[in-house]
UniProtKB/Swiss-Prot annotation:
It comes from Methanococcus aeolicus (strain ATCC BAA-1280 / DSM 17508 / OCM 812 / Nankai-3). The gene is metG. Pfam families: Anticodon_3, tRNA-synt_1g, tRNA_bind. Binds 1 zinc ion per subunit. Belongs to the class-I aminoacyl-tRNA synthetase family. MetG type 1 subfamily. Residues 573-672 form the tRNA-binding domain. The keyword Nuclease does not apply. This is Methionine--tRNA ligase.
Length: 672
């Protein structure tokens, strides 16, 4: 029996349109998986929408002199336009600022309270005497206590640290610039700590990827109750308290349920537990697609809410997309170093973007968008390999037969080489299916490319243009037709528009069967991206940041992520660093440390003890045998009383990944 799948995408925040990073991490992957699951005959719905509440909306509205609703409606429409242009399809798409959602969120809150998970607590919060109101974190700005840069009450853009408003130096109210005062007030809290054992069991039995499980475990070990109310007017009102609204991270995920309810009673089949024994519905799979910056919210807080409510199915898996940089630099909307979806699709087919963003790197890893790399990958992979084969096969079949030839009994009529290639098609389907179910989208595309390469090699070897035997020619082009049909079928979830054009030329349906229908005259479906186009688009879309870079070209200093000036070094200084491939032999936790693991590593000629701040991202057990990159000539240092004889290289902020050699190099290999 086929499963029911409910796919959700993180609710886009209505303070701006979509950029390429949003498309890559969340929306395109979800649409690809939805199309794939439907191809396999599953019952699938895709639910999404926009997140409309919170302080950033009110701040923007106040600055522009409009109502919050005006900001919400403007960007809700722009975001939906962008998603439509990316061919991202939804079965239900809503807004959190709607009667349906507000009512549903309040009912959810009441159920949590009824079950004993909501309580009141007195806290201290900044209060502006001039504005006569308590200030939510975004209404307070000041200097960062760590880097002295300008910072908001929740975050420093300069050094990237998470902040509490009370940590700011010289804080001020962003509305009137007055100095706020700390004043006692009452907030509502969700008793998340009471659910730690339930959450631990949930994560253990879920199908989440290991890196997400590890992150969830690190939070569950030290769970605190959660402040879920804010003293502002814009949001979902707390029932029976007109002075406070729900914190957006309490009410926004409930939108997944609200927007499914918009489809009618069918929502119950996806969300509600079995009526007879109140157990999870095993035939329903809920998969969340999100950006990695909100992984903890979906892996810990949201399941905690569902557990506290008690009547809903829990998510089966979470797929978190990594960050996307632009031309090697972090995207920044404030610095205008960003490419908006709406601008991009004015110049390039959205299917090309879908292909590139998924082919560029595994979904959970950070990657870079470079216009030159975009052009190169499209031209050398999609055009030179995939399109080259399919176009040649269709042109030749059209000229010789007017259709894709059909052979009724391939196992009797084809030779061993032909049959081996048909077996290759079956093997490709098998590998592709596994990669798609695991959301390994890059690997799934590699499967397609390998099949197209096999087709090109076969076509060249058979040289059908030299074959006089019509029966043999029919056999050759039948094999080419089977491969072409497989490529179109497998590529469809990634490039729905282009593959539909291809199938239209073939006069075929979206499956793996060849019917021998009359071919339309082949035309070029996949067009090469020219150098002049890339040059023109880069000048238009990267202009503001390039101008800024030109002004700063002569500077020989940069800033690190803490905002501190960083002197550039020469190659001689860099050459002093000794980097080697090491292998982890033993790993254990450092007592009384929240972040440190003690490792024993082999660097070829000796074993070293190293301390690394990767606890919570890796368990000791999964590190054994892993090859890493080690700085070997660093002076020994003590961390939490444990000596470290080197430094393990890793990357990432919220989600940390160890650096390892791309190929399986021998232990002790020098990295240069």
């Amino acid at each position: 029996m086929n499963n029911k799948y409910l796919l959700t995408t993180a609710l886009a925040y209505t303070n701006g349109p979509l950029h390429l990073g949003h498309a890559r991490s969340t929306y395109i992957p979800a649409d690809i998986i939805k199309r794939y699951l439907k191809l396999k005959g599953n019952d699938v719905i895709h639910v999404g929408g926009t997140d409309n509440h919170g302080v950033p909306i009110t701040l923007t509205a106040e600055k522009e002199g409009v109502k919050p609703e005006d900001i919400v409606n403007k960007y809700h429409n722009e975001i939906k336009r962008d998603l439509d242009n990316l061919s991202v399809e939804f079965d239900s798409y809503g807004k959190t600022h709607s009667d349906t959602h507000i009512q549903n969120a309040q009912e959810f809150y009441k159920k949590l309270k009824e079950n004993g998970y909501i309580y009141e607590k007195e806290i201290e919060q900044f209060y502006c005497p001039d504005c006569d109101k308590f200030l939510a974190d975004r209404y307070v700005e000041g200097s960062c206590p760590f880097c002295e840069g300008e910072a908001r009450g929740d975050h420093c853009e300069v050094c990237g640290r998470h902040l509490e408003p009370t940590e700011l130096v010289n804080p001020y109210c962003v509305i009137c610039n007055a100095t706020p005062q700390l004043k006692k007030t009452t907030h509502y809290f969700f008793k998340l700590s009471a659910l730690s054992d339930n959450l631990d069991n949930y994560v253990k039995n879920s199908n989440m990827p290991d890196h997400i499980k590890n992150m969830a475990y690190s939070w569950i070990r030290e769970l605190h109750d959660w402040d879920i109310s804010r003293g502002i007017k814009w949001g979902v009102p707390i029932p029976d308290d007109e002075n406070q609204v729900m914190y957006v991270w309490l009410e926004a995920p409930i939108g997944y349920i609200s927007f499914t309810k918009m489809m009618g009673d069918i929502w119950k089949e996806y969300w509600l537990k079995n009526n007879d024994n109140n157990t999870e519905n095993q035939n329903t799979k809920i998969w969340h697609f999100i950006g990695k910056d909100i992984t903890v919210h979906h892996a810990v807080f949201w399941p905690g809410m569902l557990l506290g409510h008690g009547e809903y199915n829990l998510p089966n898996s979470i797929f978190s997309g990594g960050y996307l940089t632009l031309e090697g630099k972090k995207m920044s909307t404030s610095k205008k170093w960003v490419v908006w979806v709406d601008d991009f699709i004015k110049y390039f087919d959205s299917d090309y973007l879908r292909y590139f963003l998924m082919a560029n790197a595994p979904l959970n890893r950070d990657c870079d968008f470079s216009f030159d790399e975009f052009q190169k990958r499209i031209n050398t992979e999609l055009i030179a390999i995939i399109a080259n084969f399919t176009h040649r096969a269709l042109v030749f079949s059209h000229r010789k037969f007017g259709a894709l030839p059909v052979i009724d009994k391939p196992e009797e009529e084809l030779n061993k080489e032909d049959l081996a290639l048909l077996d290759k098609c079956s093997e490709t389907i098998e590998k592709y299916n596994k990669n798609m179910m695991d959301c390994n989208l890059k690997d799934a595309l590699v499967d397609i490319i390998h099949l197209a390469k096999e087709g090109n090699n076969y076509f060249q070897k058979m040289e059908p243009w030299t074959v006089d035997d019509e029966n043999r020619l029919k056999q050759i082009m039948f094999v080419c037709g089977v491969i072409t049909k497989h490529i179109a079928y497998l590529l469809y979830p990634f490039m729905p528009n282009k593959t539909n054009e291809l199938l239209d030329l073939m006069n075929e349906e979206m499956d793996l069967e060849i019917r021998g229908n009359e071919l339309k005259k082949p035309i070029v479906v996949f067009s090469k991206i020219e150098n002049d186009t890339i040059k023109m688009v880069k000048e238009k879309l990267l202009k503001s940041e390039n101008s800024k870079n030109t002004k700063n070209k002569k500077k020989n200093t940069k800033k690190n992520k803490n905002g501190e000036k960083m002197e550039l070094i020469g190659i001689d200084d860099f050459a002093k660093i000794e980097l080697k491939v090491a292998q982890i032999l033993e790993a254990e936790e450092v007592p009384k440390s929240k972040k440190l693991l003690k490792l024993i590593v082999d660097i070829g000629d000796e074993k070293r003890q190293v301390v690394a701040g990767i606890k919570g991202h890796y368990t000791p057990e999964e590190l054994i045998g892993k090859k890493i990159v080690l700085v070997c000539n660093l002076k020994p240092a003590k961390l939490c009383g444990v000596e470290s004889q080197g430094m393990v290289l890793a990357a990432g902020d919220e989600e940390v990944a160890l650096l390892s050699p791309e190929k399986d190099l021998p232990v002790g290999s020098t990295i240069c």
